[in-house]
Amino acid sequence: MLKSFKTEIDPTEEQKIKIHKTIGTCRYIYNFYLFHNKERYDAGERFMSGKSFSVWLNNEYLPGHPEYFWIREVSSKSVKNAIENACTAFSRFFHHQSSFPRYKKKGRSDVKMYFVKNNPKDCLCERHRIKIPTLGWVRLKEKGYIPTSKDGYVIRSGAVSMKAGRYYVSALVDIPAPEADGNLTDGIGIDLGLKDFAVVSNGTVYRNINKTARIRKLEKQLRRAQRKLSRKYENLKKGETTQRANICKQKLKVQKLHHRIENIRTDHINKVISEIVKTKPSHITIEDLNISGMMKNRHLSKAVASQKFYEFRTKLKTKCAEYGIELRVVDRWYPSSRICHCCSSIKKDLKLSDRIYRCTCGYIEDRDLNAALNLRDAETYEVA
């Protein structure tokens, strides 16, 4: 099976220049593909696929425009992957899965340097370093995390990314699939929410990490840093003596705070999933939440986005597949909070402010725990 490993790297100054150059070229090619297809559409011509654009770019456009020689100086695999990503964005738009593709702005877009294993010695990994095509050997900050080539593991592909002044490598490694454990316990249900991040049917409650003093302190620092950056831009517009170098420094401070908060939230999700999977349930049932609809509520949108429900579901699905656990997804219209777990009656007048579920049969339970129990015992579901 293929498994991804992502860790921070410590490139040299020369390697940093190559990474910046490759990422910048990939961003330019992505935007050029969008622009070229827009021009063709305005001229009444047919849409050009990614493969056709790659042939046209290399055989017709670049030979006639020698000033763009720098495109050929970076890895061709990275350029081709940027074209494929742009083509996928158009495909999603044509199938009404997303909006029209937008240009990637410098410094604000998640563009990666893609690499692939073509030869046996292209991608190798040792305990303290990794070999990347066009970069050579790059030191790893976390030693021993990526499986080494010495132990027989093979890196199929990967990507180098940059965020808040830090560099990361993500490697796709071919590893043997773990054996399914036959000693599984009873199934569980998980109710996700805003008051608590997750309530499990076995009684375990995972707190909302965004309500902790640690996150609130960082968010306060972030608001101050953003105000400081905004004032620098205002002074620059007025023609005062704010230097552009100081703006870049302040932008980096804001990016580091964003990155720190995101890492804490992601780490919390990873630990919750790991703890749930270690209980070895036969199945896990979750609800198909309408995240896009919840985001339309301006009073809840920030809280919903901070919980990262979609990332939780994606990672839980991967872990369940890895350990042989069945992941069940219940329809979003299933009234898990309104059903009494004792007598199965539906309480139609239940309000969002009612945190305790009280049924006429005498059953009293926490609202979220009652929902988790109903999800565990749901009979109508889809296997993710």
Model regions: which residues?
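Stable alpha-helical structural segments in soluble proteins, enriched in small hydrophobic residues
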Residues: Y33, A82-F93, L369-E379, V383
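A generic secondary-structure signal for well-formed alpha-helical elements
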Residues: Y30-N37, Y41, F90-Q97, D196, ...
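Acidic carboxylate diad motif detector
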Residues: S52-R166
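Gly/serine-rich nucleotide phosphate-binding loop at the start of the catalytic core
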Residues: M1-V79
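Well-ordered beta-strand positions in beta-sheet-rich domains
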Residues: S4-E8, W137, S157, G187
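Short amphipathic alpha-helical segments
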Residues: K18, T22, S78-A82, H268, ...
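Surface-exposed helix-capping loop/turn segments at secondary-structure junctions
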Residues: K38-D42, F94-F100, S282, C320-L327
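Positively charged, helix-rich recognition surfaces that bind polyanionic ligands
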Residues: K3, T148-D151, K163-A384
